[in-house]
């Protein structure tokens, strides 16, 4: 993993200047920075994000020594987990660290899924784009599970977008390496509304814990409703959506984009039934991410069956051209190669 000079990173964010601050979390601050490095005969530049424990920032409220230690441990854990993973197009790319106090990751200019669905005044993404986002995140979590990592904090705020509006899973502060013989079981943690209600004891942690959280995100994507909305009754998206799914009232769930009608109705019903399985109180009945990704791929193909042959072919050609426009660009840092999509 690449190690950066601590002082150079601090200088790049103007010594934790508020003008460079782009995000705050419960355990850390995120700053935007422009880094330079010498590559053969030229100096290359890259915009990155630098994450710090909030205790390092002069503008952060004073906190106890135990709180500072907890923040530092979470960042160190995030660095350890992310540095152990190979590249995946829908997992935020780790670029390096400085003394395990500052973490450098790729910069994501288009904010989060939460912002897109619940805050932005721009039109919602199309129905198919929203389901494509759901597939991208499912593939990311499937990748993590194949490498023995349980994320433990899957939520719309931790799904970020790059310049091409490709979704990437971020924030590995609570992630656990569950691979091999490690089987680390920390105390339950996560975000209310996304946290698996069956995860009440350390020994209850499993890959299905992430499945529940993903199911909440999938309901959020389909309905455009928040995971917890105290202005509504019931406040929980799960308590609201699951009874409607069981009754087949999908038109009352799908938010924007025509997901509940026309050629998308069959797709919507399949997705919502799968979401209901993800958030089931019967942990063993929840699907694994291999099954989830396969089902979403099948759902995305469903509307094409209803189209005339020439439209299906045209759609595939257009999609192929769009993919070619997003050919991978390789950026080489000293000691590391990182592809940006």
UniProtKB/Swiss-Prot annotation:
One Pfam family named in its UniProt record: Pkinase
Tissue localization of expression: Ubiquitous. Higher expression in mature stamina and pollen.
Region spans: Disordered: 52-75
Compositional bias (Low complexity): 53-69
The Protein kinase domain, residue ranges: 16-298
EC number: 2.7.11.1
InterPro entries given in the database record: Kinase-like_dom_sf, Prot_kinase_dom, Protein_kinase_ATP_BS, Ser/Thr_kinase_AS
Binding site for ATP: 22-30, 51
Molecular function per GO: ATP binding; protein serine kinase activity; protein serine/threonine kinase activity
Residue positions of the active site: 153 (proton acceptor)
Residue stretches in coiled coil: 311-332
Keywords: ATP-binding, Coiled coil, Kinase, Nucleotide-binding, Serine/threonine-protein kinase, Transferase
Reactions the enzyme catalyzes: L-seryl-[protein] + ATP = O-phospho-L-seryl-[protein] + ADP + H(+); L-threonyl-[protein] + ATP = O-phospho-L-threonyl-[protein] + ADP + H(+)
Other comments on record: This gene is linked with a growth rate QTL (quantitative trait locus).
Family: Belongs to the protein kinase superfamily. Ser/Thr protein kinase family.
This protein's name: Serine/threonine-protein kinase-like protein At5g23170
Protein species of origin: Arabidopsis thaliana
